[in-house]
Amino acid sequence: MDPKKIARINELSKKKKTVGLTGEEKVEQAKLREEYIEGFRRSVRHHVEGIKLVDDEGNDVTPEKLRQVQREKGLHGRSLDDPNS
C-alpha cells in the first residue's frame, strides 16, 4: 500500500480520537482501512501458499489443501498433471 495512504489512515485515526471525523472522513477512513486489510490478507495468503512443510527425514508433509493450491499455481514443482506432486 502506498505510504501516503497509510499516513492518511494514521492521520484520520488520530483526528478521530481528538476532535472526531466528519461523515466524509468516516467513509474515507473505512475505505482506506478495507484497502489496507485486503492488501495484508493478500500478503499473508501469498506467504502461506509458498510454504512447503518437511519432516525430520525430509518427507513432504504439506497439508493436501495447501498442496492443491500450490499445484494450481505451479509452486514448488507441483503440477495439476501430477496428483502425487
UniProtKB/Swiss-Prot annotation:
This is UPF0291 protein SAG0271. Its main location: cytoplasm. Pfam families: DUF896 (PF05979). GO terms for cellular component: cytoplasm. Belongs to the UPF0291 family. Keywords: Cytoplasm. It is found in: Cytoplasm. Residues 62-85 have a biased composition (Basic and acidic residues). InterPro entries: DUF896. The keyword Metal-binding does not apply. The keyword S-adenosyl-L-methionine does not apply. It comes from Streptococcus agalactiae serotype V (strain ATCC BAA-611 / 2603 V/R). Residues 58-85 are annotated as: Disordered.
